[in-house]
Amino acid sequence: MARYLGPKLKLSRREGTDLFLKSGVRAIESKCKIDNAPGQHGARRGRLSDYGVQLREKQKVRRMYGVLEKQFRNYYKEAARLKGNTGENLLQLLEQRLDNVVYRIGFASTRSEARQLVSHKAILVNGQVVNVPSFNVSADDVVSVREKAKKQARIVSALELAEQREKPTWIEVDSKKMEGTFKRVPERTDLSAEINEQLIVELYSK
């Protein structure tokens, strides 16, 4: 499946919630009609079946983290193999992606932008260049901006925006050094309450 390259706000409108695909700290309600789905008949949101609700939740989370369908299914399979709650395991695996950690630290204003920084070799993990967005970040790994990329306007701007966002408690950020230490894997209570991961588990369990 190809990566979606169309208008980002359209995806948020389709899911009826902010997927944080656009930069900035303004509420998404000020940018678009979030309660209406895109298209001519967007104002009419039909009642979904149980399967439809589960599918929408999966699509919402997949798009939020910018993961393709096959990748997402593989993450679910890995989450199911791990001990503990499958849904929580899934979210933790997604949170450990390097592109997501770069976004959480504040080097990028969106996960899509973070993915570009990683792919363009602007990011170091423990002092080594890593250009794989799906790279799994472990506890105590230090993620930083490569020296020659530190003056990039988009990174400087993203760090300024990040100061206005709630900082993740599981990452220690040093904005001056442009580095962040992934202290621990986030717990479920650290993450968005708007995600119902159990619906995804129910979908894939069929």
Curated annotation (Swiss-Prot):
Where's the S4 RNA-binding domain?
96-156
Q: Is Ribonucleoprotein among this UniProt entry's keywords? A: yes
The organism's superkingdom is given as: Bacteria
Q: Name one GO biological process term.
A: translation
Keyword check for Amino-acid biosynthesis, yes or no: no
Molecular-function GO terms, alphabetical:
rRNA binding; structural constituent of ribosome
Q: Show the Pfam families listed in the entry.
A: Ribosomal_S4, S4
Function as written in the Swiss-Prot or TrEMBL entry: One of the primary rRNA binding proteins, it binds directly to 16S rRNA where it nucleates assembly of the body of the 30S subunit. With S5 and S12 plays an important role in translational accuracy.
**Quaternary structure and interacting proteins, as annotated:** Part of the 30S ribosomal subunit. Contacts protein S5. The interaction surface between S4 and S5 is involved in control of translational fidelity.
The name of this protein is Small ribosomal subunit protein uS4
Q: Which species is this UniProt entry from? A: Pseudoalteromonas atlantica (strain T6c / ATCC BAA-1087)
